[in-house]
Amino acid sequence: MESAVTPLFRFCYGESLDDYVSARNKDSSSFTLIVMLSQPTPSCTIRSAREDDISAVNELAYITFPMACPDSVGPEDIIEHCASQFSTERLLNHLCNIAHYLVVAEDQNSHQLLGYMLLVAGAEMDPTAYENLQEKPSLGVDKLYVRKEFHGCGIATALMEHAVEQTFACGYSSLWLATNSYNKRALRFYEKQGFTPVGTRIYYVGKTRNDDVVLEKPLISSLSK
């Protein structure tokens, strides 16, 4: 993997919104992480999402979110959740929110979006779960999804490595996330990435209650070992 990346996620405590937006709007070619994936997968670019990506992110979100849901979550609940979380308006808001960073994995040849990730600073994702983290301040991985046909190709790993880069760049002490306790594939992946369980939370998809595992990957303490 070739890694030459300038941090994209510019939000730090005390930074003004104007400075953040100015940095994000710079030529994206100078903020690109090129990931060479195993054949037959083409190379892809991990980069900051742009306004003209929103329609494709919306489509990708609707395709990938159901894969993370257990059988107890019905189609009506999934549709309700997607309409709430992945609307064009909501996705556009991520681009101008100083504490959010929307990232995409783009096929360099076809320009199709293969995956995406949303990072959220601090406790916004779940204040109660955040209080149980071991290392703070922490950067949350709110969403990380890859097209099913590209599972196992290294795209999710590349997105997570990019999240680690941003965590260090902004001086955060850890990464954290939550996933459904029945999503064994995701739990195995996060364990391989160095996350460990630190608690649980209740998360609703539509009207259906889900029990999530909260996981954390300390970075500052692991760096000192």
Language-model segments: which ranges?
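Acidic, Ala/Val/Gly-enriched low-complexity intrinsically disordered segments
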Residues: 2-5, 15-23, 27, 35
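C-terminal "cap" of GNAT-fold acetyltransferases
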Residues: 133-138, 173-176, 180-187, 191-193, ...
